């Protein structure tokens, strides 16, 4: 099933404004300040973070279920770091921090399955050009 997102930018880079939609229920506005100066509003990197956290959580849950250890819950926080490199904005790091409630599994197995999910979720694969993607995984 194709997924669709739409964005429109009006005006110059530093003074303009943008809007985006994704699916039926996600939408917002963004500006230069919300993207590069931690100002109010959304930015594309937040959407990447949410997409990565969601995809990773589902991939980890599926892997654990296939291994015979159904999940009560998996929560993942993703932090996308955007920095200027040689004067151009570059996503330099994505940090995934995941916690799971998985009865009947030990920490080492959970971490192993989390590493597999990080390598194999479709969004991780799409972000393969990011220089560093880190993972912290623990059981609750």
Where are the model-predicted features located?
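Extended beta-strand/beta-hairpin segments
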Residues: 1-50, 57-140
